[in-house]
Amino acid sequence: MEPGCNEFLPPPECPVFEPSWAEFQDPLGYIAKIRPIAEKSGICKIRPPADWQPPFAVEVDNFRFTPRIQRLNELEAQTRVKLNYLDQIAKFWEIQGSSLKIPNVERKILDLYSLSKIVIEEGGYEAICKDRRWARVAQRLHYPPGKNIGSLLRSHYERIIYPYEMFQSGANHVQCNTHPFDNEVKDKEYKPHSIPLRQSVQPSKFSSYSRRAKRLQPDPEPTEEDIEKNPELKKLQIYGPGPKMMGLGLMAKDKDKTVHKKVTCPPTVTVKDEQSGGGNVSSTLLKQHLSLEPCTKTTMQLRKNHSSAQFIDSYICQVCSRGDEDDKLLFCDGCDDNYHIFCLLPPLPEIPRGIWRCPKCILAECKQPPEAFGFEQATQEYTLQSFGEMADSFKSDYFNMPVHMVPTELLEKEFWRLVSSIEEDVTVEYGADIHYKEFGSGFPVSNSKQNLSPEEKEYATSGWNLNVMPVLAQSVLCHINADISGMKVPWLYVGMVFSAFCWHIEDHWSYSINYLHWGEPKTWYGVPSLAAEHLEEVMKMLTPELFDSQPDLLHQLVTLMNPNTLMSHGVPVVRTNQCAGEFVITFPRAYHSGFNQGYNFAEAVNFCTADWLPAGRQCIEHYRRLRRYCVFSHEELICKMAAFPETLDLNLAVAVHKEMFIMVQEERRLRKALLEKGVTEAEREAFELLPDDERQCIKCKTTCFLSALACYDCPDGLVCLSHINDLCKCSSSRQYLRYRYTLDELPTMLHKLKIRAESFDTWANKVRVALEVEDGRKRSFEELRALESEARERRFPNSELLQRLKNCLSEVEACIAQVLGLVSGQVARMDTPQLTLTELRVLLEQMGSLPCAMHQIGDVKDVLEQVEAYQDEAREALATLPSSPGLLRSLLERGQQLGVEVPEAHQLQQQVEQAQWLDEVKQALAPSAHRGSLVIMQGLLVMGAKIASSPSVDKARAELQELLTIAERWEEKAHFCLEARQKHPPATLEAIIRETENIPVHLPNIQALKEALTKAQAWIADVDEIQNGDHYPCLDDLEGLVAVGRDLPVGLEELRQLELQVLTAHSWREKASKTFLKKNSCYTLLEVLCPCADAGSDSTKRSRWMEKALGLYQCDTELLGLSAQDLRDPGSLIVAFKEGEQKEKEGILQLRRTNSAKPSPLAPSLMASSPTSICVCGQVPAGVGALQCDLCQDWFHGQCVSVPHLLTSPKPSLTSSPLLAWWEWDTKFLCPLCMRSRRPRLETILALLVALQRLPVRLPEGEALQCLTERAIGWQDRARKALASEDVTALLRHLAELRQQLQAKPRPVYTSATACDPIREGSGNNISKVQGLLENGDSVISPENMAPGKGSDLELLSSLLPQLTGPVLELPEAIRAPLEELMMEGDLLEVTLDENHSIWQLLQAGQPPDLDRIRTLLELEKFEHQGSRTRSRALERRRRQQKVDQGRNVENLVQQELQSKRARSSGIMSQVGREEEHYQEKADRENMFLTPSTDHSPSLKGNQNSLQHKDSGSSAACPSLMPWLQLSYSDEQQL
């Protein structure tokens, strides 16, 4: 490339092949197949099948190697020439005691070599100066014009290059008459070269190989010297023209400092533009521009005069031959000659100090050839891991990016830039040519010590295994016994980025194959063999300096040249990137080179095939001309293969025969020439037993085998017969022939090869005669098959003739198979495609043209005659259309049996298909036929589109299409009606159905519409029937009709009315449920309204209650023993209700008797065998705290059931003592099994009945409610009659008087100390003790002494217990029994009546007060009161904390914390709300359901009013009564 052209253009890609698995099985065969294409490029790339992935078999832990060191810019030929030139010019100045500094021009180091070459090409220095063409020189160096760079280049050339050129040409003894130039600018910055010889550099650290670092090293440090004490140094001021002596390396030191000397070597030649003011200097060129600076190591001394004459004669100037002026004589340190300083060119003004050599020594030193270039070995040994770490680190640091992200194109351009750069030194390492036997191959090897897996064994024997390929049967190298490293034995390569392999061809011009096991790509460049000599010529032309000293430079694998440079000179170059798992093949004499893109591992080996033999012979002649050593003897290889011809592959045998013939002819010619020279002596020599260095020609270095010329007098050498005149000067009689075979033995070997080679020719002649029918006789199939078997058995090559034979056999077999298909019958022909008539005739012609005698040809002729006869009949039938369909079908069946496709059969097929289709259409559309579906019609239309057109078919197809369009349109309408949200009325559906009656197609949506209309009509009829019946319809019937009506896709006006009725009925039932049912009740409304069917069975009743409480019991409609149908008859329901009342009464009486017989839990001891009561919790109630139900007489835990509250009785006042009317206290207890509902008042029930009368719907619950109301009113009438009797009225009047008396008495006081004693002591307390305490005045707390709000209602009630006396009335049995029966019947009613309460007071007053029950109730109420106070305090604390938290969180909290506080605050508020709601519900239900009658208990009304105040105040009568203590007995029951 021209200087400055740094842009690299990638060459075209080489061929890439991807063999199939079948092709991949024969490696050398596949390479031979692609050779005609790939050989034109020199290299090719092969991608194995994707599944072919051999395992990596190298022992990674033991793999250690020492890489080579590669300095990139020394690899490229032109760059190396430049560096060698710099070495020479640097040596030129170094010999004179100076060092070279390379100037910078335009901020780039000046290319001195290119400048020198261009000056020579332009005619030389004098011509350029004369023609003023320095600007052209700058232009050719690619410097920008217009900056006066030409003058600057001229200055640098004159100062640095021109003196060296003068010394090289020997013109240093001639004066140069050029004139000095004026007004020159000052030099640019210079950088020292200081380049030692490359091969003399000892390896050191990785970074020390940089040439640039050495060339750009700083100037030597000056040496401190005491100048004041050295008179010689004082005199050294200026040496002739040029700058001051800055390169002397000396500087004055301070007097106070110790003297020490720094040796600086070498000194410097400093080139400057400035001229000095010396007046006595010469005007020669070198005097103007050079100042030679002496070295400080040694000081040159003048020769002193000696008294001896012999010394005097030696002090003579070699120029003028005079010895005078000895003070001006210079002594040469190289040859000891003397020169006057004024006789030199240029003359020197004074004697220089330091080393000095004369011009003759300088010229001799510069003329020495450079040492041969080669790679150095690194000092560090690597493992794969350590080398990989180093390589990846170097690449990532160099490109400043991850190694896998560096583009290959960028890296390729950077590589060629680096190898062409003289100022940038990049050094890499390459683990190349590593012998596999030391560390193992990358492929599995069969003879390895390790046990191979089945998969590894498969790869170990694969032909693509590089250990196997060189020794395959078709390979030539398998006949070489020695393991030739790199050729027959693979070499391993471990590369890093920029590590390169230079332009080269393989030894003996053999093939090579390279496999990249893993790692980053390897970039290859290849040149075909036809351009190999052209490449050598171009490289010699561009770099003659290298090839003059090393003619075999390209064989040393140390030289690169840019592919763009080669391509610019007409050399065809291709490239490729070899990725992991890919092969690269190089062909014989194909030059190739490349470099690695990064860290990778490759393996390579050579192989030789039969087609290589001519190239191998030409290579030996080429080596002979270059005097290069051979790797093996080509003649020995040929003779060894010829000695065993039967073991050779046939292709190889043919090629060896040709080469052997040429070799024998050449040997005869050479021996004849030897005989003509007069050499007659000869002796046999087994050359193969001699070492190669003992049988090499001393002239051309060729390894001899067939013969050699030796001399008795010169036993140390021999020559090949091509150089018989170069052995020695001895007489021919003293020379003798050393031969391996005689001339008679060689033809014998050639004949054996010929037999092996001609065996194929004999076979080929037989095949040729058979295939060409040259003798007029066709061979039988068996004879042709025998020829093919012979080729397979004798391993004949896969030649064109063999392929023709195989093709012929394949055609014969195909014809026989077709004939058998024709004549073997219809069944055998069903699976095989039919032949056309044309194909039948072609088959007949083919059978006649084949070179094989086939007796089946007669059968084919018979079939052809039958087909032609059938054609005539078919044409006659088609000509007389319309023919009978049966006739057409029979003709078609006969044609199918022929096994041949006749053109007329196709027409018959069309006619039959048309007739069949038309029949199907008629049958589908016939009025009497069953209507077909849309799918059938569409199928007919699709079939009609496939058959051939005719007028009748087209008409039927159009009608069918129109019918299908109409049907699909009505189907869409029906679908819309079925799926639309807005339902259509029945009239619309009827209209759609009427329109589709005449369509002869079954329409699914229309059918669904019909069914929906039918169901709608039936639904309307059902609605009319139930609406016009004798009774209102039942709710269940209406709900069923509504559910059915909603599912119908028809708009029904009656549906909306029914939905309204059902909604109203549900609303009434929900209202009734809220009125009767407790919250979370386990009973249904109907169960509550009806009499309890199992009232007499305690166990059944209790188990059912527990099952319902657990959600396990499901009630049915048989509450009254009626079925669902009987519930629809009002009369049956009333009769069943009456019977249920009687059963309930009988059952409760039986239950009371049973439970009364059970022992009381309050008794001191219980009999183990006696039956006991069981609480709802499943345990036996015992001890204090057990309560007995007033209805069923069973016992329960007070804490397991809801109990009445005594505080719901009238409150005491400060002036009266109504609490002493104990018979009015609410001590009545009904268990949850007896009290199943809220028991609303009769007025509420009557309101529900009024609403029920307005419903046009019958509900079982409504009728049950009516029965319950009638039962309650009936009981109320009987109770009123009983209470209105004279005896009972008198008793009631007496009770009223007692109450008035109690109200007139002052309020009793109670002591705080003994207030709770009766509760704590239980039933054992003595009333007299309590009364005694009451008389003690010290412990009495008067109402005036009580602090407001601190009185305790519980303590007050407890203190009144001792004062309770009774009975207050005497009830005769005649009065008591009816009242108790009424009381029992009233308790069975799920209704609250005032008469019930009045009867309860009478019965209570007629018996002593039940102090045990009162104490139990007080204890339970006290326990509940304490729990309520605890909940109240917790609630109050939460409210306060909430306020504090809200106030604190308002200030400086972030949004997230604020939301969290709000969430917690809302949780607290919801909890508070639930607590307040809980208490409010209890209070409301207490006030709603347990308000006593004002007629009989006037005090209760005031008590009720006083309890409705939730907040206690100082003016309240009893401030300690909290609202949550007003929980009623009814509320506790529902909780």
Swiss-Prot record:
Mind listing the GO biological process terms from this record?
Answer: chromatin remodeling; regulation of DNA-templated transcription
Q: Which SUPFAM superfamilies match?
A: ARID-like, Clavaminate synthase-like, FYVE/PHD zinc finger
List where Basic residues composition bias occurs: 1428-1441
Start and end of every JmjN domain? Answer: 14-55
The molecular function terms of the Gene Ontology recorded here are: DNA binding; histone H3K4me/H3K4me2/H3K4me3 demethylase activity; zinc ion binding
- Give the boundaries of each C5HC2 zinc finger: 697-749
Position(s), cross-link Glycyl lysine isopeptide (Lys-Gly) (interchain with G-Cter in SUMO2): K205, K229, K244, K272
Cofactor remark from the record: Binds 1 Fe(2+) ion per subunit.
User: Mind listing the UniProt keywords for this protein, alphabetically?
Assistant: Chromatin regulator, Dioxygenase, Iron, Isopeptide bond, Metal-binding, Nucleus, Oxidoreductase, Phosphoprotein, Repeat, Ubl conjugation, Zinc, Zinc-finger
- Annotated ranges, domain JmjC: 458-624
Top-level taxon of the source organism: Eukaryota
Q: Name one Pfam family in it.
A: JmjN
- Tell me the residue numbers annotated for binding Fe cation: H504, E506, H592
- Write out the ranges of the annotated region (Disordered): 192-227, 1425-1519
Entry binding sites for 2-oxoglutarate: Y430, S512, N514, K522
E.C. number, please?
1.14.11.67
Q: Please give the family membership noted in the entry.
A: Belongs to the JARID1 histone demethylase family.
What job does the chain carry out?
Histone demethylase that specifically demethylates 'Lys-4' of histone H3, thereby playing a central role in histone code. Does not demethylate histone H3 'Lys-9', H3 'Lys-27', H3 'Lys-36', H3 'Lys-79' or H4 'Lys-20'. Demethylates trimethylated and dimethylated but not monomethylated H3 'Lys-4'. May play a role in spermatogenesis. Involved in transcriptional repression of diverse metastasis-associated genes; in this function seems to cooperate with ZMYND8. Suppresses prostate cancer cell invasion.
Please state what the annotation says regarding this protein's domains.
The JmjC domain is required for enzymatic activity.
Q: Provide the protein name.
A: Lysine-specific demethylase 5D
Q: What's the source species for this entry?
A: Pan troglodytes (Chimpanzee)
